[in-house]
């Protein structure tokens, strides 16, 4: 994961020396604490400034690849992404082993095929945002993958054009998923209300073996989901550099963690990770809970005004309760694994202190719900809590030492609800319009993910020097889901029929408790939402007052 900052300004402009740009650069550095690099070139009256920060996650663990990537001809690439595969038939020779840097390999491929930029970018499997300058045509390319899994914002003001992973003023807007190109001299004349070149939504996803896609949820169908999820996790986990020597006990050096509530999405992912992570490594389970004054008030005795003896504001959070339950289930199923339950407890005072920076990070998302979700991910990605390593620690949690995760990669279950009918709105659509209404609502959720979720979450969690990865948004897995009959994935006419195929997989993996948990949004499960008295009826869609 990296931070991208590009600026095009006239020669006489002092944009880069402005306090605003310096503040922006500081945020870019936070995204990539391992390295920060710059490159500058001129094109007529214009200065092109490329800046990148690097969180070292690809390539040899003892050799960081600097950015921006620059070659002897003057081509430049700022890359923030992960390439799992390039599908285009013209580039079938593109191979990437786990000791190679994907950005460097892509840069070489783009430079060696100057007429195939669109084809190459459109063939990438994996999350990405990028800025690429092609010196031969004086053309600037920029964009995000079709799902918008990495953030990229733009600002065009007073002939200054800025592309950045994060923003710090109301001038910034989100770059639409897809890729865009323009000759440098024409950039100040761009009308961004008109669409530039974009990745077509009809781009074929990877092929799927359709031989099993028949009938109801059969053993073969669940087994195939198992296979696809394992592959998605292998791509996202096994490429992470180890934090210790292979001949040492690595149980104290988790290189990966799961955003963990104890639900079926994260529960299945955690259980499958046990099958691919070496046995001598631990896995961190990140569980966040908030002190919520409004929720706490509901526990006070109406006559005395006192809280129950031994009341704990964090223990009553639903995600803490299901998280501990799911953690104990994992210990029972996989006793040889060291499962670190990282309990992150967030006092209300810390929430008040963090609100303004989180508002800035989530922008241009700007609703009450965005802030609640942003706060949950902000503190979760900081990874500072207490460490529970066995069931007996639950009784001793107030005596346990503090613990901060070392992992740079967070695994998220986002994408399961959107594709497998996990939201209440899916049930309502099914009740109103039947299967056609359900399928329409499912497609709307996929279409909205780039703007509603992914850019916002990337900006928040990357600010802590962390990268979030989404196995359920793996292109091959999404292709699998798109080929399956809706009734083979979910049965909303049945109680507990949402995400039915995933729940069945969870049961087979030995996690029946996690498999029966209902959907609960992180802002409600962690109690990050509606914290102050009188906000119980506040709509999550209400706009925030954001001053940036």
Curated annotation (Swiss-Prot):
Annotated localization: Cytoplasm; Nucleus
Residues annotated as domain Asparagine synthetase: 239-519
Domain Glutamine amidotransferase type-2: from-to ranges: 2-193
Pfam families found in the cross-reference section: Asn_synthase, GATase_7
Keyword hit for Nucleus: yes
Cellular component, GO annotation: cytosol; nucleus
GO-annotated molecular function: asparagine synthase (glutamine-hydrolyzing) activity
Gene3D superfamilies registered for this protein in UniProt: Glutamine Phosphoribosylpyrophosphate, subunit 1, domain 1 (3.60.20.10), HUPs (3.40.50.620)
CDD domains: Asn_synthase_B_C (cd01991), Gn_AT_II_novel (cd03766)
Biological process per Gene Ontology, one example term: asparagine biosynthetic process
Active-site residues, record numbering mapped to chain: 2 (nucleophile)
Keywords: Amino-acid biosynthesis, Asparagine biosynthesis, Cytoplasm, Glutamine amidotransferase, Nucleus
SUPFAM superfamilies: Adenine nucleotide alpha hydrolases-like, N-terminal nucleophile aminohydrolases (Ntn hydrolases)
Name this protein carries in UniProt: Asparagine synthetase domain-containing protein C4F6.11c
The organism's taxonomic lineage, starting at the top: Eukaryota, Fungi, Dikarya, Ascomycota, Taphrinomycotina
